Amino acid sequence: MASISAKLVKELRDKIGVGMMDAKKALVATEGDMDKAVDFLREKGIAKAAKKSDRVAAEGLADVEMHDNTAAIVEVNSETDFVASNDRFIDLVKEIASQVALEKPADVDAALKLKSPKGTLNDDIIEATQVIGEKISLRRFATLEKGENEHFGSYLHMGGKIAALVLLEGADEETAKDVAMHVAAINPKYVNRDQVPAEVLDHEREVLSKEAEGEGKPANIIEKMVTGRLNKFLAEISLDDQEYVKDPDQTVAKYVASKGGKVKSFIRFEVGEGIEKQTVDFAEEVRKEMGQ
């Protein structure tokens, strides 16, 4: 049997919001596998849904810039929120996004080698790090290309804590911006149901089936329950099926269609998502500084 540490139990409790004994029981039953433990708790009806474990740690800004038929969305990290509001840092983020839209590099390493008035983007980042006094890094970026009768829309929430980029076929830029605002607020995972991978559907169907079985319903009722809950799940993660944030009486797809278009693609960056915050023991830090 796998050894279940207190740290692992706490991680599961923080992730899904269950009691200590339930968390430990689930981890023991699944031999310490975090993902299987989450499913175990959901299937038992102890937890209805798993909360994301992405503890936002890094600060910084995301930005969207466009050049001709290319749009770029970038995330640049700093160590503190204070630096993220620094004008020099803001200008640096915009410069990076603009250069990425212009040059369309293959990856982060290639982006850092792009030419700038002071040398390369990497040189600019190093200089900003030295002047501002905090580590600054280009974490990620993505680009979209538009064709004839296609429109970009972008939206920055809280000055760039969340950035959304949308590509519509048809409609217009104003509609695209409205959809980008929705993407920033609601955080869909896919454009439509057809994009949801089969393994995601199979996994959710299995969990929902076991959850329904645990409620002691007849088989025919269970099938209907699972179908209904699966449809609800798909509507929650598919942009086209979501209730449009500015008019909940219609879906995003219907809103865009009313403007003569359809959603082709979107990208959403939330600063620091997926990066675990480093916790520092202040007393221990002082002891290290004193060489103890």
UniProtKB/Swiss-Prot annotation:
Keywords: Cytoplasm, Elongation factor, Protein biosynthesis. GO terms for cellular component: cytoplasm. The keyword Cytoplasm applies. Residues 80-83 are annotated as: Involved in Mg(2+) ion dislocation from EF-Tu. GO terms for molecular function: translation elongation factor activity. It is found in: Cytoplasm. Belongs to the EF-Ts family. Associates with the EF-Tu.GDP complex and induces the exchange of GDP to GTP. It remains bound to the aminoacyl-tRNA.EF-Tu.GTP complex up to the GTP hydrolysis stage on the ribosome. This is Elongation factor Ts. The gene is tsf.
